[in-house]
Curated annotation (Swiss-Prot):
Catalytic residue positions: C11, C14
Keyword Transport: yes
Keyword Nucleotidyltransferase: no
Species: Methanothermobacter thermautotrophicus (strain ATCC 29096 / DSM 1053 / JCM 10044 / NBRC 100330 / Delta H) (Methanobacterium thermoautotrophicum)
GO molecular function terms attached to this record: protein-disulfide reductase activity
Database matches in Pfam families: Thioredoxin_3
Record key words, sorted: Disulfide bond, Electron transport, Redox-active center, Transport
Cysteine disulfide partners in this protein: C11-C14
InterPro entries, sorted: Thioredoxin-like_fold (IPR012336), Thioredoxin-like_sf (IPR036249), THIRX-like_proc (IPR005243)
Name of the protein in question: Thioredoxin
Domain of life from the UniProt record: Archaea
UniProt family annotation: Belongs to the glutaredoxin family.
């Protein structure tokens, strides 16, 4: 099972990134577990300098912007 981590404090951009990621996973039919990481120490430990962020299986893929559903689908496939 793929693990997708959404880094953010719950802001509108963070929520949009999560929505796009969930839609991408659904459209691709991927079995994935989502984890929201809101604690600033964990966000900094992951190496993020801007929010929101998205990691796949612990590897940071997106930082500081809201990726489109199509971009996320490319990352996941």
């Amino acid at each position: 099972m793929m693990k997708i981590q959404i880094y953010g404090t719950g802001c509108a951009n963070c929520q949009m990134l999560e929505k796009n990621a969930r839609e991408a996973v659904k459209e691709l039919g991927i079995d994935a577990e989502f984890e929201k990481i809101k604690e600033m120490d964990q966000i900094l430990e992951a190496g993020l300098t801007a929010l929101p962020g998205l990691a796949v299986d612990g590897e940071l893929k997106i930082m500081g912007r809201v990726a489109s559903k199509e971009e996320i689908k490319k990352i996941l496939s």
